Every structure is written in structure tokens, then in C-alpha cells.
Amino acid sequence: MNFLHFLTTSLLLLGGSRLALADSASSAIKIKGNAFFNSDTNERFYVRGVDYQPGGSSTLVDPLADTSICKRDLPYLQGLNINTIRVYQVDNSANHDECMSALQDAGIYVILDLATSSNSISRLDAASSYNAVFLQGIFATIDAFKNYTNVLGFFAGNEVANTAENSATTTWVKAALRDAKEYISKNSDRDIPVGYSAADVAEIRVQCADFFACGNSSVRADFYGMNMYEWCGADSSFTISGYDQRMEEFANYSIPLFLSEYGCNDVTKESDGTPDRPFDEVDAIFSSEMSSVFSGGLVYQYSEEGNNYGLVVIDGDNVTISKNYETLKEKYASAANYTGDGDYSSSPATLTCPADDSYFTSFPLPTMPSEAKGFIESGAGQPLGFNAPSNQEFSANATALVSPGPHSVSTTINTNIVQATISQSSTSGSSSGSSSASTTASSSSVSSGSSISSGSSSMSTSYTSASGSSAHSSGSSSGSSSATSSASTFNLSRFYVFAGILAISGLVFA
């Protein structure tokens, strides 16, 4: 797409929109009390956006690294009158300057998931998936995006706990969130918020939210997202949907709360079978009816991925907008007029951590794996991107031997334990000789036990919302059984690269 075509498309889409001359997203977003604010103007910031992952969240595609994707989609994103997108996974080894700069100029902020479909906390075995490989990956992603002012924040996990039975998995997600916050405090020039995006599970809805918001500032989430699809169709309302009950449940919530996914598609269908989504909930979300508790939301989702949630249909370089796109465009144009502090709470009391009950279980947060502690002080090292070894491979019992040239790495991977022996021989200057170093590392055992199996093989990455509509299946939400590799499929070359980072950086401790 050449620049003239890009500009023409932008003007056609924007038409008479009040955002034709969008404000730049050059001011960082900060948190005060239970709300977001523009750090320069001190005006309250309401998240008004869409979830954006062309190709689907289970496919390893980085839409912020491919400039052709950015140039294709940006006019349509602007046309929706949005100020925020959520991106579910990125390649931390790629360059994102052009896309992030274009989004900033268009007045669009980014909320980014740190996990990927191959590097995430597994709901099937959360304890062992919380390891050095996982942390190196999310730290490297922080490094890749920390200098972009229009990064609003990071999600440490997405829908990892999707039933009451696997609620204990939140323990390891919160540990990862804590570690990400510490990494940012030591390795970033600005304090970028870190939060969690939760499935809307009625039995644990409040307990899960309170769990992430409780504790001191070093461990609690900075914000909280809910994936909520309860408002369904033109016959729904503030009370029928249960939104009034959500307002009561979270009236005293202490951190910014927003809908990280919303937009039910269990509605009246068009003649071609596509849903006619009225998006009437937008009128409530961006009003005094909800602004004291909620700070906006993100409609799921921008592109059609075979699940009837898409606002546009993408075919190569061609984008076709739907009736749903036009509906949301008008709703968001009206929502953009809602300003003011929204009766937010400037100094809410810190929440008490929920007690375990028949629905919700938590454990003391595990200590950071010893192999990963050096990343905090020395940095994550080389970003490995989508070629990184999966942390799920470290979750299975496996043994690998890698011998590329003069280096050899013998690694035994057990549940919750990584043992590595690294030997190296070298020749230097006019004299020859060899030196060897042997180091063994064992990750810290979790105080609550060596392992917790938080689900059964019947658990999947999809869930059903309270309204009964089946929501999407997100590859970055957790490691499913298909993401866990056996020893026979363990990728040795990728593991060697990672082991080399540990060895060279001196991060494998005796």
C-alpha cells in the first residue's frame, strides 16, 4: 500500500469523525487510585478500543512487527474512533519502531500480553511452567517495548484460571506479575503497569479479582481486566446483563478495572449468518452509571477468525468492514464525548486477600527460580522471539544433550527442577589449553508443594461466559496439553541457545 492509498483510505474511513485529527498518544498513561490518567494533561483516560490479533491468538504472528499489516489496518483502527488496542502476542526479537510510532501518531495506546501461545503459565501444570525460560521470555518482551510511550501496560496472563477447579493457577500468574514489576523497576526508565486479564467465572469472579489486587505494591496487580460477554443483544440492559451486579461487587475495588474483552455475539443473525451486534453496552460503560468503577473496555475483536467475533474480514491486503464495524464506530464516536473524572476513587483502601473456600484456592507466592534471578540485575539478554524454547518443554520430564562444537550442554529437566552442566574448552593467544566449568542449578521449590495439577485433560482454553455464549479460545491464555512437548520433541537447538544465554550471562548458579 503506497502512502497516497494509505492517506486516501484513512480520510474515507474517518469521514466526519471527531477523531480525524487524532491526538498523539505521546503522553504516558499513569494510575491514580482506581483510574487511569494522562500524565501530561491529568485528564482521566478511559480505555476505548478493540482486541487486535490478525491471524488469531493461537498463531505465532506479530502484527506490530509486520509493517504491511500495520499500514493495512491502521486506517480501519482509526476509523473505529478508538484510543487503545490489545495485542495478545509479539515477537520480542523483532523491530516494532515503525508500527508503534504510527500507532502513537494516530493516538492509539497498546496493552500487550507478555505470554505467547508457546510461553505461558500452563493451567495443567502451573508450578513447573513457571520457570527461567518463561521469565526470560516475558522480560525480553518488556525490554522490546519499554521505550514506547504509548505502551499503556502489560498483561502477565490471560484466562489462566477458567474454572473454580483450577483457581490455584493464579498463584503462579501473580508470581510472574510480581517478577515483571520488579524487572521493570530495575530495567525501565518509566514505571509501566502490569495487570491480569481474567475469564468471567461466576464462582470465583470476585475472589480472583481481589487476589490480584491484594498485598503490597510490589506484588499486587496495577490494573485488572475482565473478559465479560454478559450483555447480549438489543433485548439486554444494564440490569438484565448483570452489569448492575458487577458494579455492586466491585464498588470498592482498589485498582483500575476495565473490560479486556467484551461484545457478545449470541445475538440476532444477518441473512448471511453473521451476528448483528448492537453494542448497546458501550452507552453504559462510558457513562456515569459505570465510570466510578470501570475505566472502559476493549471489544473482541478486530478481525474475523472463524468465530463470528470479527469487525472486519481480511483477505490478503484487502479489508472488508462489516455492519458490526459501522455500529461500533458510531457507538465509540459517542463514547469519546464522555470526559471528566467519572467519580473515581482517589485513595481506595488496599483489599484483603481472599480466604480459600470451596471455589477459590491460592497458595503463598513461590520465589523466583534461581536461574532467573540474574535477569533482574543484568537484563534478559538476547531476545529469542518465536524461536525461543517453549517453557512447556521444561514442564515435562526430559533429558537433552547438546554438543555443538567445543561447547557441550547436558541438561536434565524435571518438574520444578532444572539441572544444567556446562563445560567449555577454549584456546587463547599463543598458548593452548583448556578450561572447564561445571555448574548445577536447582530452581526454588514452591513452598506450597513441588507441583500442583490444576486440572484434567478435559480442560480447554475456551470458556463459556455467564450469558451462555461461547467465547474465544486464546492460545496465549495458558499451556494446553498440545503445548506440552515430550522429550522426543524437545527442540534441542532452541534450548542450546537459551542455555548459552544462561551460561554466558553467569546466570546458572551453583
Curated annotation (Swiss-Prot):
The active site is at residues 159, 261. (1,3-beta-D-glucosyl)n 1 binds at residues 88, 158, 300. A lipid is attached at residue 485 (GPI-anchor amidated serine). GO terms for cellular component: cell surface; extracellular region; fungal-type cell wall; side of membrane. This is 1,3-beta-glucanosyltransferase gas5. It comes from the Eukaryota. (1,3-beta-D-glucosyl)n 2 binds at residues 159, 200, 205. Disulfide bonds join 70-99, 214-353, 232-264. It holds the Pfam family Glyco_hydro_72.
